[in-house]
């Protein structure tokens, strides 16, 4: 009897040992495989520290993802994602008979950098097909993406003063990435997000888009409220050569694209604004007389434009452009259109043509 059962027990023991060895080795195999894929990302290079597998629930966790720019001197990574959790959607598997996954990013950070005249020192994501890279990192069809306590920054390390703008506490979700075509022939994914702009101002944003198109058809909305303008002084000083002494503001953006043609607007509404302050600006030895004169001009322009009854003023800048631009992706082209519109919204300009001489 003992010999009769010894072979099955031995085989079972070998299988158990092999499974344990596979369980121990597999995370390292997956990690090295992913690092090999992330090493070749065009202008960027990625690396992860380790992988945790939970095969019993059809999930795995990626720890310590960092993506950095290869060329140029950029002191911060483009992407820093401490934890990425991917799990098969059992609801979709059971009810829709589809193998799709939900992915959650915990405490991710994305850093955009303006390098000034030296474009190699800029970091915008240009030079890499990010949809293809996401497919390498998460090789399964995604239905839903969630972001928890994320952060988005805009930096300029070479400007005077250096610029560090950010949106923190980002909570966002993207739904229906694998949506089928509806009755109207559309395939719309939905994005919803909230954050704190500059650490204090509530920001809300939403969008709908076709996940399988090249960002040619979409609708986008963003609103930030109660921005303390003094917190934008580094940005205003570096790009507009003035700073705020007081005031609060809101910003609303609405944009849409149809067949790659973008339309929309940016509308800032500023309240109780003070730009020029004699004690702060003229008596401040760190500021030149020319800087003080410029701030006085900007402050004077603000006085002319504002609604005296409500002590507020607003402007509206129309957005237009095409997302098909040479050498950059459609998404980058849209961000460029937004950036140009935002700068234009805060630049003083004449509203009527110059009168004829004589």
Give residue spans per PLM region.
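N-terminal leader/targeting pre-sequences
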Residues: 43-72
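N-terminal type II signal-anchor transmembrane helix
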Residues: 1-43, 357
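Short acidic/polar mixed-charge low-complexity motifs
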Residues: 44, 199-201
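Secondary-structure transition motifs
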Residues: 64-174, 270-300, 314, 321-352
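Extended lipid/amphipathic-ligand handling interfaces
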Residues: 38, 51-54, 81-96, 112, ...
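Short, intrinsically disordered, low-complexity segments enriched in Ser/Thr and Pro
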Residues: 178-182, 262-266, 343-358
């Amino acid at each position: 009897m003992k010999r009769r059962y010894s072979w099955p027990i031995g085989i079972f023991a070998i299988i158990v040992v092999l499974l344990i060895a596979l369980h121990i080795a597999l995370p390292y195999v997956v990690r090295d495989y992913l690092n090999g894929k992330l090493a070749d990302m065009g202008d960027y290079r990625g690396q992860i520290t380790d992988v945790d597998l939970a095969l019993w629930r059809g999930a795995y966790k990626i720890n310590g993802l960092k993506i950095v720019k290869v060329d140029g001197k950029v002191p911060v990574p483009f992407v820093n994602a401490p934890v990425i959790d991917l799990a098969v959607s059992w609801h979709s598997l059971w009810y829709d008979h589809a193998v799709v996954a939900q992915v959650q990013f915990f405490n991710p950070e994305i850093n955009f950098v303006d390098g000034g005249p030296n474009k190699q020192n800029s970091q915008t994501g240009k030079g890499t097909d990010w949809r293809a890279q996401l497919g390498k990192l998460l090789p399964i069809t995604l239905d839903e993406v969630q972001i928890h306590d994320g952060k988005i920054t805009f930096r300029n390390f070479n400007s005077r003063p250096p610029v560090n703008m950010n949106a923190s506490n980002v909570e966002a979700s993207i739904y229906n990435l694998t949506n089928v075509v509806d009755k109207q022939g559309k395939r719309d994914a939905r994005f919803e997000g909230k954050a704190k702009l500059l650490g204090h101002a509530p920001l809300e944003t939403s969008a709908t888009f076709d996940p399988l198109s090249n960002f040619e058809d979409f609708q986008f909305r963003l609103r930030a409220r109660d921005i303390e303008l003094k917190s934008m002084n580094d940005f205003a000083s570096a790009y507009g050569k003035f700073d705020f002494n007081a005031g609060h503001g809101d910003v609303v953006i609405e944009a849409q694209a149809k067949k790659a043609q973008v339309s929309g607007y940016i509308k800032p509404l500023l309240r109780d604004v003070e730009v020029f302050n004699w004690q702060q600006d003229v008596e401040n030895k760190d500021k030149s007389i020319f800087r003080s004169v410029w701030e006085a001009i900007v402050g004077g322009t603000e006085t002319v434009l504002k609604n005296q009854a409500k002590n507020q003023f607003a402007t509206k800048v129309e957005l237009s452009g095409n997302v098909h631009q040479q050498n950059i992706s459609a998404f980058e082209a849209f961000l460029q259109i937004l950036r140009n519109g935002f700068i234009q919204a805060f630049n003083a300009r004449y509203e009527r043509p110059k009168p004829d001489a004589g």
